[in-house]
């Protein structure tokens, strides 16, 4: 009888422990939840801390605050970072450009566009890159104007990169004109802008538009053009995948430049595996 009683008591103890474990799993403690993710109040506190740092007299501290706000990837943090767009320091204004991106394109694009006319080259360049990261077609007109009119090659290159990041077909004509003017004019002033030309060629490939093939083939086929640009054109043609590019790519595959030859062969395999 005693043995039966002990067995029954053991059985009840097991049931009790099992029920307790299930309760803990179904209802985790507040401390356990706090380990999983920061509380709302902690996030708000951190945003407020960085907001206060934006009032510092030290430009480096203000820039660091913007970097931290941007790294939070929250709209509330990016909204606080908006004030940095009008900071007296170019370094801070440039840092604010990417810090506001968590607002989404509807808010960030209108906020960034004025910075593309900033007197400081670095600010214009960073705002162009940031506009590209919005992936918004609403930024194309501004970026196109920047590509065509800015006096600094670094800014124009950033605009071309940004147009590629957006990847909208509406930018093909402008990008093609940038590339073909250099491809058809030989030793022209534009040929010196190697980063602009490379960025334009790559951006054309990112649009995936067959309308870009003519300009890219012209660049690839022009032996007077800088090899880096021709290689980028070869790669872009592979990204588009139009068989119309195969003759030019096959010619480039026999180039004495091993890197151009390799890029052309890779694109040929992509188009005609």
Task: Show which residues each predicted segment covers.
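Bacterial N-terminal signal peptides that target proteins for export
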Residues: 2-15
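C-terminal segment of classical bacterial N-terminal signal peptides
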Residues: 17-28
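N-terminal leader/linker segments that initiate helical-solenoid repeat arrays
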Residues: 26-79, 91
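Amphipathic alpha-helical scaffolding segments comprising HEAT/armadillo-like alpha-solenoid repeats
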Residues: 40-53, 74-86, 105-117, 136-148, ...
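Short inter-helical turns and helix N-cap capping residues of alpha-solenoid HEAT/ARM repeat scaffolds
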Residues: 57-58, 88-89, 119-120, 151-152, ...
């Amino acid at each position: 009888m005693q043995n039966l009683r002990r067995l029954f008591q053991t059985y009840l103890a097991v049931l009790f422990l099992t029920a307790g474990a299930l309760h803990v799993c179904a209802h985790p403690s507040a401390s356990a939840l706090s380990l999983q993710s920061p509380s709302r109040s902690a996030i708000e506190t951190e945003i407020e801390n960085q907001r206060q740092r934006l009032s510092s007299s030290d430009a480096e501290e203000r820039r660091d605050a913007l970097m931290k706000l941007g790294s939070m990837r929250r709209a509330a943090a990016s909204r606080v970072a908006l004030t940095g767009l009008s900071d007296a320091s170019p370094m801070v204004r440039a840092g604010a450009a990417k810090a506001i991106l968590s607002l989404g394109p509807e808010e960030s694009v209108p906020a960034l566009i004025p910075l593309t006319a900033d007197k400081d080259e670095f600010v214009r360049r960073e705002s162009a890159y940031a506009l590209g990261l919005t992936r918004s077609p609403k930024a194309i007109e501004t970026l196109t104007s920047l590509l065509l009119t800015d006096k600094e090659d670094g800014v124009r290159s950033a605009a071309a990169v940004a147009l590629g990041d957006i990847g909208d077909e509406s930018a093909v004509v402008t990008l093609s004109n940038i590339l073909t003017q250099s491809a058809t004019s030989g030793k022209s002033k534009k040929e010196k802008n190697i980063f602009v030309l490379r960025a334009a060629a790559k951006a054309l490939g990112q649009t995936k538009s067959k309308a870009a093939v003519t300009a890219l083939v012209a660049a690839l086929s022009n032996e007077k053009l800088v090899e880096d640009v021709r290689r980028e054109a070869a790669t872009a043609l592979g990204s588009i995948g139009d068989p119309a590019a195969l003759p030019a790519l096959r010619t480039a595959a026999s180039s004495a430049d091993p890197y151009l030859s390799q890029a052309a062969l890779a694109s040929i395999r992509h188009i005609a595996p």
